[in-house]
Amino acid sequence: MPSLRPTLLAVAVLSAGLAACQPQTAPAPTETKATAAAPASDPAVDARLSEISQQWLDGWFRLNPVSATQIGKHDYDAQVDDLSAAGRQAQVDFAKKTLAALDGIDTSKLSRENQIDAAILRNQVQGDIWSVETLQSWAWDPQVYSGLAGGAIYNLMAREFAPMPERLKSATARMQKIPGIYAQMRENLDPARVPKIHAETVAKQNAGILSLIDTFITPNADQLQGEERKQLDDAVANLRKAVAEQQTWLDKTLVPNAKGDFRIGQKLYDEKLQFSLNSSLSRAEIKQRAEGELKRVRAEMYAIAQTVLKDKPNAPEMPADPTPEQQQKAIEAALELAYAEKPARDQVVDFAKQTLAQATDFTRKHDLVTVPNDPVKIILMPEFQRGVAVAYCDSPGPLDKGLDTYYAISPIPDEWTPEQADSFLREYNSRMIHLLSIHEAMPGHYLEGAHSVKSHSTLRSVLRSGLFAEGWAVYTEDMMADAGYLDNDPLFRLVQLKFYLRTIANAILDQGVHVDNWTKEQAMELMTKQAFQQEREASGKWTRAQLTSAQLPTYFVGAQEHFDMRKAVEAKLGDKFNAKAYHDQVLSYGAPPVRYVREMMLDEPIK
């Protein structure tokens, strides 16, 4: 997930956690390369693309300094993004200039790797233009600004990419500029277009930036002396005042006057889906496939229920050909067996550490994929990130070498009642936390990010695909269960399928909400009944579906493309197929959209 911390103009390609770790040894190929027969590329055209890519990277970092810090480009650590009308126009002009340069290239004369880079750069700049001119989230989504303000500090302070005094000086400069972000927010947002849920969420999270100051800045302030210390103290004091003033504006002006529709509608949704996913599947195809998978997976879960409930007292009726009600009751009864095993409310993070070690050992022992040696640290999710996702893998930027990857988990809030906490822990039971560690860390996001850093180009690293990353993470859940994780425990497979049902439901829910005008009741029925989610988890997802769009399907669509690609390569190689060699090769391309990896693996034209 990164997937999934907002910056204004980066479409979803940048949202899935920008990863980089130590390079791995190049994998052995799983096939004989047939590309030698392809026409040779023109070195001059390849060089021209390299020049355009570098110009785009330099300009994009300059225009998006908060994201640049996250990616590991530290020339602009004292700056923040300019979201004024002039700043937005500069973004559009720059993107159009890049697009014109790309139009001047004959892509058929590029190497296959460079054809991919040209395609993903084109998608990015077209998406940037569309985001400013058509989607216009700067005019209606306050999360753009709150995410930028929080990220401006967090991206500087969360990792030791430079000595603390140096980062504190950059933080001082950014804290001086954050009141300007708030001023642009008040200037740009049209309350009539701002959805109520967006306004309320940002009003609740507004003070979260102060917890970042208290966590990262104040305890380290004595590392600056003299005038530099005074500037930092003044910046903190002024920021506290600005946050309080912003809170008043949010509570008294924005929230009461927010009248926008959180549904973006079919036209914007279809366009955003294309830019965000860069997939070969259309919205209609995604829906058809997801609905088919929903039926198939529920049938498989019913078969497991028949096994684990056999001879249990008070087991429900489980005929060979069940009614929908019988299927529902049997699966629910089987899941109850898994829900009963859960950590205490204050032990979630410790248990996650244990599962991470177990999943890592299993992946190594079964030789599923090359496991890197880079450290993974489990941390509590920063306050300003809470409220949307339960956990995410926060990897260092592709240009920051050798730094820690964070596996961030949201603790159970102290104010939750025992009933609320129990609902959460039924969802995040012991087996589910195993799955979360597989998905987010090993061999999911963390491992994928560590492999992807050895990508062939900086552009590929910076524009790594959320579709590839999230799809890989879902694919690995199935891969681990197939390999017999937790001693082939049928309840682990049951919970894994339930976790996959969530992925399926995400894809159906997102277009249901934004295109088909679903009510909360329809959404909750899908999640709590058909996908067996707990009330609290489903309620959080309903909120997320309102606050985001074209991001929830990433997991399902990416997974389908990974499953399809593996089947295609297995069919081509037959007995020569080797899973570890396959996985290492899939991860060797630097996480572009899966469609391009498939074209490379199968020697198909890049298109």
Task: List each model region and its residues.
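Bacterial N-terminal signal peptides that target proteins for export
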Residues: 1-9
